[in-house]
A protein has these predicted regions:
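Short, well-ordered beta-strand elements within core beta-sheets of diverse protein domains
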Residues: 126-132
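Short glycine-enriched loop/turn motifs at secondary-structure junctions
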Residues: 120-126
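Active-site and NAD+-binding cores of ADP-ribose-processing enzymes
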Residues: 1-85, 90-95, 100-114, 118, ...
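Short active-site loop/helix that positions an aromatic residue
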Residues: 135-146
Length: 232
């Protein structure tokens, strides 16, 4: 994971140089890349506290830029008509004879934290809830199960929860010249974090997942900053 991530960052740096990126942008790309890789290196050396501290400092560096941190209803992670109510969905898999109640569709209670899994943004032992903005998104995330095993429910959020935006797409890259400098630099920082947190773990039964180190550290950093979650 670390070596592959380094290769991806090298590609980003080379592409930025080739496109004539300014010195400040190059400094952001190199600086953020090096610090994320350093965080991984420290984690592998069992210096977990300092590894997490590096990611926390990166989140603090991004600050309160509204492109990066905003309420659910105003976040750039969910483009569209702001006057319409945002709808989210939550799904669970279960046999046809299992009738899920409303309380079954929220996250595990803290009394059952021993059953919480090790997922991308889930801190082990701390139940969390994954939502999609469509039932189709839920179906994809649960592995495209048979309809008879798929249970989905709408979830209505108050909308004032502050979330960290990792829903960054390369399609935005074409529009960077239209943005002000501050937003371009914010986009670059978020993009480098997005690369580190977007790996797919192909081995289902693997206990330790290096690919989730930065993701889970980022979630802990967001909790310390008082954010309600991460959009990705």
């Amino acid at each position: 994971y670390k070596e592959d991530l380094k290769n991806k960052y090298d590609i980003v740096q080379n592409q930025a140089r080739a496109s004539g990126a300014d010195d400040e942008s190059m400094g952001i790309i190199i600086g953020f890349s090096d610090r994320i890789l350093k965080s991984l290196e420290l984690y592998y050396k069992a210096d977990i506290a300092e590894s997490n501290n590096i990611i926390l400092e990166l989140v603090k560096d991004i600050g309160n830029n509204p492109f990066a941190v905003n309420s659910v209803v105003n976040s750039d992670a969910f483009p569209g008509d702001r006057t319409n109510e945002l709808q989210f969905f939550r799904s669970r898999l279960g046999p046809p004879n299992k009738a899920f109640k409303a309380k079954d569709m929220i996250h595990l209670p803290n009394s059952m934290r021993s059953k919480s899994g090790n997922y991308r943004f889930s801190i082990p032992g701390n139940p969390s809830m994954y939502l999609a903005n469509s039932s189709y998104g839920c179906w994809i995330e649960t592995g495209c199960p048979a309809e008879i095993d798929f249970n989905v429910s709408p979830v209505l959020l108050e909308g004032n929860q502050r979330i960290f935006n990792l829903a960054i797409s390369l399609r935005d890259f074409r529009c960077l010249n239209e943005f002000e400098e501050e937003r371009v630099h914010c986009w670059l920082k978020l993009y480098l974090l997005t690369i580190a947190t977007s790996y797919v773990v192909k081995e289902e039964n693997r206990t330790f997942k290096s690919e989730y180190i930065i993701s889970q550290s980022l979630m802990m950093a967001c909790k310390k900053m008082g954010y309600g979650g991460i959009a990705y």
